[in-house]
């Protein structure tokens, strides 16, 4: 099931990659088991009053657990928040890169090299793995993907893609989570 991509504002959006996490995480403990590092944040185009942030564990853990249902990347949807002064979740391998990226929907692809693609069909990097089929079989729907290859000077996931799924009810996407990630 797919939601109407017409609801997605595909204008350019600020995407903060690296640096300090949003301030709303200053007093939150995100994991009992893994060290988590802030990867990126952006305003949710499906709900402009919310922000989406993604955290990643150490690379070897992320690589070992990169598929559904065991993916260790953490997506948190939260209230709008400015950048923290605390470096508690700062990723040790990336400096802050603040950029303006275009979002796209299925009709724009593949002509546009957009950092974030909302709706439509999954565009896998690693053909033949059927990661999408496993997630959909459990009643989840594709919401968006983050294309790291379209982000200048960023390669935390080996120029890969992060795939986000959730529940689709009418034109609302709820309970988003990172289902898996692939690398090129």
Q: What does each model-found stretch correspond to?
A:
Residues 1-184:
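Preference for intrinsically disordered or flexible, low-complexity segments
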């Amino acid at each position: 099931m797919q939601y109407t991509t017409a609801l997605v504002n595909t204008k350019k959006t600020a995407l903060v990659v690296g640096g300090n996490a949003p301030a709303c995480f200053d007093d939150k403990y995100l994991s009992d088991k893994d060290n988590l590092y802030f990867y990126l944040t952006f305003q949710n185009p499906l709900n402009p009053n919310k922000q989406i942030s993604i955290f990643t564990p150490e690379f070897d853990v992320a690589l070992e657990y990169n598929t559904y249902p065991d993916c260790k990347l953490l997506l948190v949807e939260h209230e709008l928040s400015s950048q923290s002064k605390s470096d508690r979740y700062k990723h040790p391998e990336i400096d802050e890169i603040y950029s303006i990226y275009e979002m796209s929907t299925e009709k724009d692809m593949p002509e546009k090299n957009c950092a974030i693609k909302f709706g439509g069909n999954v565009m896998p990097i690693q053909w033949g793995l059927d990661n999408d089929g496993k997630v959909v079989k459990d009643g989840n729907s594709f919401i968006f993907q983050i294309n790291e290859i379209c982000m200048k000077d960023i390669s935390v996931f080996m120029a890969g893609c992060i795939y986000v799924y959730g529940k689709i009810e009418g034109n609302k996407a709820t309970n988003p989570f990172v289902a898996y990630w692939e690398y090129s």
